């Protein structure tokens, strides 16, 4: 059983005899309080989708839920439903946009390393690799000699996400994006 301080986003936990997916974690250190940090977790019930905000001490032990991860690839979207195909047995897994709205900003048909998380055979969330490769579809023109400066500019990616990139990046370039930090991580290898 991990401590509250070891829990990460998109982890499935058991709490009050229910299974929740942790979607957001805020760490705070109360002033004048001997002891550790507090972790406020925003969780969603995997069955009902209801939101629960709960605060844990850093030393609180938390039960992890039984879950299965399957390697998948993005197949298609149908309205607010996004369908992912299992890489081994081609089982389709359908997820609602509200369950994966942050992650879907970094997913297209070419994204590799996606995992769907199943709780009781039901898909509840997707997990992305640390870095994904996406194409810049719109940004200000690159400036000659800009690699010497460290200024950034906004760039719209092929998935619709907007991140800050160095000035030497231009429209049409393929770049690596750190999904967790939503930051430019370098040029993609050709």
Curated annotation (Swiss-Prot):
TM segment ranges: none
GO MF annotation, one: translation elongation factor activity
GO cellular component, one term: cytoplasm
InterPro entries for this protein: Elong-fact-P_C, NA-bd_OB-fold, Rib_uL2_dom2, Transl_elong_fac_P/YeiP, Transl_elong_KOW-like, Transl_elong_p-like_YeiP, Transl_elong_P/YeiP_cen, Transl_elong_P/YeiP_CS
CDD domains in UniProt: S1_EF-P_repeat_2
Single biological process term from Gene Ontology: peptide biosynthetic process
Alphabetized NCBIfam families for the sequence: PRK00529.1 (NF001810), PRK04542.1 (NF003392), yeiP (TIGR02178)
Annotated family: Belongs to the elongation factor P family.
Protein's name in the database: Elongation factor P-like protein
């Amino acid at each position: 059983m991990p401590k509250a301080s070891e829990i990460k986003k998109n982890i499935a936990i058991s709490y009050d005899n229910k299974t929740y997916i942790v979607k957001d974690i805020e760490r705070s250190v109360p002033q004048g309080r001997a002891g550790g940090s507090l972790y406020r977790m925003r969780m969603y019930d995997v069955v009902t989708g209801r939101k629960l905000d709960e605060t844990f001490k850093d030393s609180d032990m938390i039960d992890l839920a039984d879950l299965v991860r399957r390697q998948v690839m993005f197949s298609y979207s149908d309205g607010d439903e996004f369908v992912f195909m299992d890489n081994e047995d081609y089982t389709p897994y359908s997820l609602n946009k509200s369950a994966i709205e942050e992650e879907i900003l970094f997913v297209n048909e070419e994204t590799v390393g996606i995992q769907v998380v199943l709780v009781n055979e039901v898909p509840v969330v997707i997990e992305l690799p640390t870095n994904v490769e996406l194409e810049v579809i719109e940004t200000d023109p690159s400036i000659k000699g800009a690699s010497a400066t460290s200024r950034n500019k906004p760039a719209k990616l092929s998935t619709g996400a907007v991140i800050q990139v160095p000035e030497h990046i231009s429209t049409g370039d393929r770049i690596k994006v750190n999904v967790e930090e939503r930051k430019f991580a370098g040029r993609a290898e050709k």
